[in-house]
């Protein structure tokens, strides 16, 4: 690698636009020349998006917290034969979580993933829970990657296609290519050969020092309205610096993943969807267990086209989700529609079980909290009420797991609790003393916690 590496080339090689300083400050600036206790494992957080609603009749546990009955979509989480152990006793099934702040402003249905970890509608400016924990609360400060933002099938940053949002309301791009994820986690920085590694680090740090100086000067001149963007850039630079300073992982690197002909769903990537999903899960679990990061999100793309995997119906979207006919107090529903939607749900929870299996095999599950949620409850109605929400808690968090919590209330149990309260509770589990989370003109939605999580 050339020792005369420019700032622009350096930042581009690390996935940061070399023009970002000028772009974000155009019009007002000159052109730019948590520590774990001794002996205790650090706490980790993973957020997982589960797509396309749920067949509530087959998602809800039965008496005795039975999640393995015939047809249950949660059965993979209690399948020791397939996944090495049952995760039933680590599980909290939360029925009655509403994406209330989104409902208030119409950020619902397929846009609802915007609300899952932010507790805010489309115009919210707060960070999502993962970024709050990693950046603002600081649990990502000691790892090479402050956080990981992974996806399968879509790298879009549209409102309804992202879980992770930086402060200021900026969506964080997802890494959807396992080969890139592997290179970022286990590859040689900047593509240098092993003998060039130290010179590459020195050159990178030299450029980084100059960019940091540019950023400091711009920040002093910036109007208040631009400070949040500059803070985001400063966070990105700190992450780059950590990665340059970090030595190779002490745990064994997995085998490099293959290159896939196509990566995106809806554009021909469907035949590879299952293999890509498994690789992303395995790399995520390895990153957590190697302490390369302590915070991550995984966005599983909407399963709406044929040929993604053999057991799915031809069109999960129009022919399955939109034809789901729920049972309620005044309507018996259509069991055949539940069974069809349950195929997709069962597949998704099988992938969640794979993630838990990999974390358990690496000894990282006890110190990890996994939050898995979707953007819709009843997909036929595009309803963001009673979204399927699971917490899988390691033993270090002190939650009373292995049970079902029905948080629904009101007429026909049609009302739930705002997901903001769950976000407050999770933040508290990581030692963040917050009493509210998210943004809404209806501030009553934002405050409070779910004391029932502890039993």
Pin down the residues of each PLM region.
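Ligand-binding pockets and gating/stacking loops
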Residues: 2-455
């Amino acid at each position: 690698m050339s020792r005369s590496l420019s700032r622009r080339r350096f930042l581009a090689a690390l996935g940061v636009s070399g023009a970002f300083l000028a772009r974000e400050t155009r019009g007002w600036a000159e052109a730019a020349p948590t520590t774990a206790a001794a002996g205790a494992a650090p706490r980790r957080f993973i957020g997982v998006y589960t797509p396309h609603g749920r067949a509530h009749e087959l998602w809800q546990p039965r008496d005795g917290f039975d999640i393995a009955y015939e047809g249950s979509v949660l059965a993979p989480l209690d399948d020791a034969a397939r996944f090495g152990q049952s995760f039933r006793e680590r599980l909290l099934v939360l029925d009655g979580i509403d994406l209330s702040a989104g409902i208030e402003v119409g950020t619902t249905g397929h846009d609802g993933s915007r609300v899952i970890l932010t507790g805010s509608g489309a115009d919210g400016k707060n960070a999502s829970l993962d970024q709050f924990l990693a950046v603002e609360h600081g649990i990502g400060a000691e790892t090479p990657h402050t956080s990981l933002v992974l996806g399968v099938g879509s790298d879009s940053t549209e409102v309804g296609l992202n879980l992770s949002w930086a402060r200021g309301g900026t969506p964080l791009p997802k890494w959807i290519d396992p080969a890139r994820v592997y290179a970022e986690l286990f590859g040689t920085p900047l593509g240098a050969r092993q003998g060039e590694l130290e010179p590459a680090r020195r050159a990178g740090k030299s450029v980084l020092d100059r960019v940091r100086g540019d950023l400091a000067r711009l920040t002093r001149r910036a109007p208040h309205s631009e400070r949040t963007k500059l803070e985001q850039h400063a966070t990105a630079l700190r992450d780059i610096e950590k990665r340059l300073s970090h030595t190779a992982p002490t745990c064994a690197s997995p085998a490099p993943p293959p290159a896939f002909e196509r990566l995106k769903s809806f554009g021909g990537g469907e035949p590879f969807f299952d293999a890509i999903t498994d690789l992303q899960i395995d790399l995520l679990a390895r990153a957590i267990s190697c302490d390369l990061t302590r915070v991550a999100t995984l966005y599983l793309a909407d399963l709406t086209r044929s040929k993604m995997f053999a057991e799915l119906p031809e069109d999960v979207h129009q022919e399955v989700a939109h034809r789901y006919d729920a049972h309620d107090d005044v309507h018996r529903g259509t069991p055949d529609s539940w069974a069809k939607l349950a195929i997709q749900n069962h597949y998704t929870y099988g992938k969640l079980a794979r993630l838990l299996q990999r974390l358990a095999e690496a000894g990282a599950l006890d110190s990890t909290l996994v939050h898995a949620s979707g953007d819709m409850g009843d997909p036929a109605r595009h309803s963001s009420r009673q979204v399927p929400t699971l917490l899988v808690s390691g033993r270090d968090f002190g939650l009373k797991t292995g049970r079902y919590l029905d948080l629904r209330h009101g007429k026909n149990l049609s009302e739930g609790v705002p997901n903001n309260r769950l976000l407050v509770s999770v933040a508290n589990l990581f030692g963040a003393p917050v009493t509210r989370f998210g943004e809404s003109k209806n501030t009553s939605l934002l405050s409070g916690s779910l004391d029932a999580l502890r039993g």
